[in-house]
Curated annotation (Swiss-Prot):
[4Fe-4S] cluster 1 binds at residues 594, 597, 600, 635. It comes from the Archaea. It is an enzyme of class 1 (oxidoreductase). It comes from Pyrococcus horikoshii (strain ATCC 700860 / DSM 12428 / JCM 9974 / NBRC 100139 / OT-3). [4Fe-4S] cluster 2 binds at residues 606, 625, 628, 631. The keyword Repeat applies. Binds 2 [4Fe-4S] clusters. In this family the first cluster has a non-standard and varying [4Fe-4S] binding motif CX(2)CX(2)CX(4-5)CP. It catalyses: indole-3-pyruvate + 2 oxidized [2Fe-2S]-[ferredoxin] + CoA = (indol-3-yl)acetyl-CoA + 2 reduced [2Fe-2S]-[ferredoxin] + CO2 + H(+). Residues 585-614, 616-645 form the 4Fe-4S ferredoxin-type domain. InterPro entries: 4Fe4S_Fe-S-bd, 4Fe4S_Fe_S_CS, HACL1-like, IorA, Pyrv_Fd/Flavodoxin_OxRdtase_N, THDP-binding, TPP_enzyme_TPP-bd, Transketo_C/PFOR_II. Keywords: 4Fe-4S, Electron transport, Iron, Iron-sulfur, Metal-binding, Oxidoreductase, Repeat, Transport. This is Indolepyruvate oxidoreductase subunit IorA.
Length: 648
């Protein structure tokens, strides 16, 4: 059986293979002779990093899981300054974390080709917003490439390295959830000899303070350079292999479609049976090439711009048309929604309205049927996995702090604690935000410990923040230092499942593992003690009583308390046991002891436990039970009993 990693490394130019969009990006990086790759995982970009981790050593590429996107960007940047081709990848909100360095470096330029892959998430399938990276790139004057197919996802990477070096500027490769996760045919290109041999590349850094030091005197002359450079990219994109005009030359109407919208437009026109439309396919949404625009607009009377999210291309086209006195009817966001991802239906409706034709399908009728079916479907909210240690931690927190407490939380699997029956998440905003919000609430509601006028005793509001291990290292550290320094009065529970679970079980500083060998493990409790936390403890959440008692004790402490709740992610651990051919414990309900009180369902909420309406007893699905024993600990009647021994 051929593995994906083998395909990504295949030395078979011209061979057609099936790859995920994110895997194709890795192949493109290898064909482009990448030297250094650094990233923090974030859906929908995670498979880029995971695939690179699996092939890097064999290809002679240095690859790391960085602690956050800013660090990853700076790692890749410095490799570029040393003359190596480098790449970083992140989800769209990850660019916010890297923005400080990103914006400054736009003035400074690069040496070796530098690619910043940013995976946007229209419709917010796994994100807190759907910000459009193209708009940020326009703000920063950084060029953007956007693939319309898996083949382009690969080919654009090599091209991006080349133009990045040609003009001395980093390039953004903007993908979306769909282009990241779609599969398609890819014709492989040639691998460089160094990649074939797995020869590690080392750079050479030449000191140049005027370029690399960002004091105002050095930076001031660079702003004109930045503006001149983006215009050079605009000229370059007039002949880019990823931009072209298709359709009849005598067409009176035209459609501009950047990135994946091109594929949707082609499908929409096929549905509508229309072929007398000229199309400008754009693989470079910023900057839009004016020379190509001029050719495209020749002879047209009306133009529609079909793009996801923000009117980035539309605004550029309209400004160009106005500046050149081109009096043509231009439509965009008046027909194409500004929110959520592009779909074939959306493209069909927009194009049909633009052309004044009927859609081939009665979408309203489908909507009405969908509503009726939706009413019949039982609610299926997401849930923490069976045996998830976070469930036990949340249960203990809620019991110790009581529901009257305030529970700021963070970004990770544990965000699901917002749902019943746990309901132990009151706020989330961004990575590391739990500790900052907890501190702010503590100051606003109770006051700092150093203040004379502060609330104490029963007047004091209990605030318990929850944050994951990877998130703690990502952006939790500055917030913890701030809370300790400013004498906050909060409990911070670090839910350490010993892996970056939500994005695909990647390592982090708390695991001590790296793709290129053993790393240095950093223990969260040691960091908390070194920072000066007033109370620090480590618990095993599979022991709910111990966890509850420790949290109760921590809540009595004046100051910042840190409790590390450490137990391996159940999904990750079960995978290990399966690969080792080992079994895990299983629990079942003793019907004679079960009183039907439903505490296991209404307060604990493990998905392996269900209600037998006929017998009015709780049941355990043996195929879902992973044997953590939490149910046996929360049941007041001892109705849950272990029926199979095993490891966990």
């Amino acid at each position: 059986m051929v593995k994906v990693t083998d395909i990504v490394l295949w030395d078979k130019p011209g061979e057609k293979v099936l790859l995920l969009g994110n895997q194709a990006i890795v192949r493109g990086a290898l064909e482009g002779n990448i030297g250094v790759y650094a990233a923090y995982p974030g859906t929908p970009s995670s498979e880029i990093t995971d695939t690179m981790a699996m092939v890097a050593k064999k290809a002679g590429v240095y690859m790391e899981y960085s602690t956050n996107e800013k660090v990853a960007f700076e790692t890749a940047l410095s490799a570029s300054w040393a003359g190596l081709r480098a790449m970083t990848a992140m989800k769209h909100v990850g660019l916010n974390v890297a923005m400080d360095s990103f914006m400054t470096v736009s003035y400074m330029g690069i040496n070796g080709g530098l690619i910043v892959v940013v995976a946007d998430d229209p419709s917010m399938w796994s994100s807190q917003n759907e910000q459009d990276t193209r708009a940020i790139a326009k703000f920063a004057n950084i060029p953007v490439l956007e693939p319309s197919s898996v083949q382009e996802a690969k080919d654009m990477v090599k091209y991006a390295f080349e133009i990045s070096e040609k003009y001395g500027q980093m390039v953004i490769l903007r993908t979306t959830t769909r282009s990241s996760h779609m599969r398609g045919d890819v014709v492989l290109g040639e691998l460089p000899q160094e990649i074939k041999e797995g020869k590690r590349k080392f750079g050479n850094f030449k000191k140049n303070p005027e370029k690399y030091v960002d004091i105002p005197a050095f930076q001031r002359p660079k702003h004109p350079w930045l503006l001149e450079t983006i215009e050079k990219f605009r000229e370059e994109f007039n002949t880019s292999p990823f931009n072209w005009i298709e359709g009849p030359e005598d067409a009176k109407v035209g459609i501009i479609a950047p990135g994946l919208s091109y594929a949707y437009v082609k499908e929409a026109l096929a549905w509508l049976g229309i072929d007398n439309v000229k199309i400008l396919k754009l693989g470079t949404p910023f900057p839009v090439p004016y020379g190509l625009l001029e050719k495209f607009f020749n002879g047209l009377e009306r133009v529609l711009i079909v793009e996801e999210l923000e009117p980035v291309v539309e605004e550029q086209v309209k400004v160009w048309a106005f500046d050149n006195n081109i009096n043509i009817e231009i439509h965009g966001k008046d027909l194409v929604p500004r929110v959520y991802e592009m779909t074939t239906r959306r493209a069909v409706e927009a194009v049909a309205k633009f052309l004044g034709v009927e859609t081939p399908i009665n979408f309203q009728e489908i909507d009405e049927k969908y509503k009726k079916v939706q009413e019949m479907v039982p609610p299926r909210p997401p849930s923490l996995c069976p045996a998830c240690p976070h469930r036990n931690t949340f249960f203990a927190i809620r019991k110790a702090a009581t529901p009257r407490a305030i529970f700021p939380s963070d970004i990770g699997c544990y965000t699901l604690g917002v749902l019943p029956p746990l309901k132990t998440v009151d706020t989330t905003i961004a990575m590391g935000g739990s500790i900052g919000v907890a501190h702010g609430l503590s100051i606003a509601l109770n006051g700092a410990l150093g203040e004379e006028q502060r609330k104490t005793g029963k007047e004091k509001k209990i605030i318990v923040a929850t944050i994951g291990d990877s998130t703690f290292f990502h952006t939790g550290l500055p917030a913890l230092a701030n809370a300790i320094y400013n004498r906050s009065n909060v409990l911070i529970v670090v839910m350490d499942n010993m892996v970056t679970a939500m994005t695909g079980d990647q390592p982090n500083p708390g695991t001590g593992e790296t793709p290129h060998g053993p790393g240095k493990r950093i223990l969260i409790e040691e960091v908390a003690r070194a920072m000066g936390a007033d109370f620090v403890a480590v618990v095993d959440p599979y022991d709910i009583k111990e966890t509850y008692e420790t949290i109760k004790k921590a809540l009595e402490v004046e100051g910042v308390s840190v409790v590390v709740s450490r137990r391996a992610c159940a999904l990750y651990r079960i995978g290990q046991l399966r690969r080792e051919g080992k079994q895990w414990p299983i629990y079942q309900v003793n019907e004679e002891k079960c009183t039907g009180c439903k505490i296991c369902i209404n307060a604990y909420g493990c998905p392996a436990i269900y209600w037998d309406a006929e017998k009015k007893k709780a049941r355990v699905d043996p195929l879902m039970c992973w044997g953590c024993g939490g149910c046996a600990q929360v049941c007041p009647f001892g109705a849950f009993e272990k029926v199979r021994e095993g490891e966990l």
